[in-house]
């Protein structure tokens, strides 16, 4: 990778996921869309903390949100994530991929 812009974008994505709870959120969203309350219960983390981490992931365009009634549900952004097989989800960084294995 010699393009400084591409390197900067990649570093920003890696920085956004470089926190254990954010990795756990990504893992939870791998199975489908969820709202903040659902994620907080699954992760046993305070809602305010989940909201903060979702904000960071949303800012990096790793997750997307959609209003459904009274709730906002979050899902993985297909621009960065893909399921090429049933065995794993991949975060595509352009020059490399990070594998999130299915449990």
Where are these regions (language model features)?
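Amphipathic alpha-helical dimerization/coiled-coil segments
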Residues: 1-5, 9, 78-103
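Short, intrinsically disordered/low-complexity patches at protein termini
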Residues: 48-50, 59-60, 87-89
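Charged, low-complexity, helix/coiled-coil-prone segments
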Residues: 1-4, 13-14, 68
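Beta-hairpin "wing" of winged helix-turn-helix
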Residues: 59-68, 75
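Single-residue recognition of alpha-helix boundary sites
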Residues: 33, 64, 86-88
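N-terminal helix-turn-helix DNA-binding core of bacterial DNA-binding proteins
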Residues: 9-15, 20-49, 55, 71-81
């Amino acid at each position: 990778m010699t393009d400084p812009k591409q390197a900067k974008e990649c570093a920003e994505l890696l920085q956004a996921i470089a926190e254990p709870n954010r990795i756990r959120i990504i893992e939870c969203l791998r199975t489908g869309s969820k709202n903040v309350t659902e994620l907080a219960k699954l992760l046993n983390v305070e809602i305010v903390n989940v909201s903060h981490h979702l904000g960071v992931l949303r800012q990096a365009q790793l997750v997307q949100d959609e209003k459904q009634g009274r709730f906002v549900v979050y899902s993985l952004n297909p621009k960065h994530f893909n399921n090429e097989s049933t065995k794993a989800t991949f975060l595509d960084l352009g020059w490399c991929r990070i594998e999130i294995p299915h449990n």
